[in-house]
């Protein structure tokens, strides 16, 4: 991927929100997001740090990028994390021993990110991992923020799209494997068969 050398942007566009200089074809060149810096674990935590007006304990905490002690649209940043893999690769490995052969094809993608939600289908249909590891008063050090209402949420995206839900989607998988045995030619003497594998 190349980078955007120039794009007609308003002069007042904040430096961290510009598309110029970002990688072509990535989320970083297309989307603005709040940068997650954790979860509001307690009321004191919420009261002592700038937050959106509807934020509650258990919500994702966003970075005050410009340091003005408030969280608003000026704090969104362009995330330089591509939705389309920047690196795709394959590895073909093979070995033989006597009449046996083993071949494997590995395939992978790297430097790719996916924006994921912990809710699917009807409202309130959360994944088990999210539900079991969400913030609650009894579990303030949870892995995930509190459960949320899809229509008014700080945690789940919507009007407050944020990097908490941006996950590395790089992978390496075994696409195919073949174990073969080459039957000795002596087995087929006197037949039109030249070999069987």
List the predicted regions and their residue ranges.
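Extended hydrophobic secondary-structure segments that form protein cores and membrane-embedded regions
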Residues: 1, 196-197
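Conserved small-residue
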Residues: 1-83
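Transmembrane beta-barrel strand/turn architecture of Gram-negative outer membrane proteins
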Residues: 1-33, 88-124, 177, 181-182
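Extracytoplasmic gating/loop element in the C-terminal half of outer-membrane beta-barrel translocons
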Residues: 29, 54-57, 109-195
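Glycine- and acidic
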Residues: 75-77, 86, 90, 159-166
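Generic recognition of flexible, low-complexity loop/linker segments
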Residues: 78-80, 89-92, 185-187
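Membrane-spanning beta-strand positions in outer-membrane beta-barrel proteins
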Residues: 101-105, 188, 197
């Amino acid at each position: 991927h190349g980078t955007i050398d120039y794009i007609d942007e308003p002069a007042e566009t904040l430096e961290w929100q510009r598309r110029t200089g970002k990688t072509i074809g990535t989320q970083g060149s297309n989307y603005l997001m709040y940068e997650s810096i954790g979860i509001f674990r307690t009321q004191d935590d919420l009261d002592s740090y700038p937050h959106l007006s509807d934020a509650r304990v258990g919500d994702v905490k966003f970075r005050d990028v410009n340091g003005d002690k408030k969280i608003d649209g000026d704090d969104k940043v362009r995330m330089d994390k591509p939705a389309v893999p920047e690196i795709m690769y394959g590895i073909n490995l093979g070995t033989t021993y006597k009449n046996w052969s083993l071949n494997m094809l590995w395939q992978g993608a790297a430097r790719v990110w996916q924006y994921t939600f912990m809710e699917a289908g009807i409202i309130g249909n959360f994944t088990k991992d999210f539900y079991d590891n969400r913030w609650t008063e009894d579990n303030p050090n949870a892995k995930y923020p509190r459960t949320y209402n899809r229509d008014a949420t700080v945690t789940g995206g919507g009007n407050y799209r944020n990097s908490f839900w941006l996950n590395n989607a790089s992978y390496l998988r075994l696409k195919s494997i073949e174990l073969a045995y080459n039957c000795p030619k002596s087995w087929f003497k006197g037949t039109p068969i030249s070999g069987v594998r």
